[in-house]
Amino acid sequence: IEMFTGFFDDAAEKPWGEYLKGILDLAVAVVVAISYLHYNSSEITIAITGTTIVIPPVVFAILTVILVWVSINVTNCSDGVDGLSGTLTIITLMSVFVLDNILKVNDSFNYCILLFAVCLLGYLWYNATPSKLLMGDAGSRAMGIFIASAVLKMHSPFMYLLVAAVLIADG
């Protein structure tokens, strides 16, 4: 859904306003939070200590909405024609992959992370000078939602601050 909102914004003759995009991002973040809580618990793991904490579902949903909304917008803000956003997303996803392998939390989702990273490598190949392929909002927003999903599936949502620190600083 998020990819389509970015695509339609890119394709529009008159770009959508920041408020409309923000509201659409918020709506998508709410859908992600509800979907995540439907299929997963509201349990998080503090990676450093290995402590597991159960957060009330309503609080977890609010924090998930914030995480997804921030991830979408931070990744979108770092998007440019030079492949910066794609490169930073690969670094972020590989950090999630390594940490998830160390913590042994969700091995099955790691294959999705690797697949997404390989797809981004293909994009970066064609984005190199002279650029033949541009990502636009469609790609950067999809990357943001995937990063948030990967961190959520790791059951360590606060780890986003560490693994996406460069994206946050740039965005």
What are these language model-derived features?
Residues 1-169:
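"…together with the soluble PPM/PP2C metallo-phosphatase catalytic core" -> "…together
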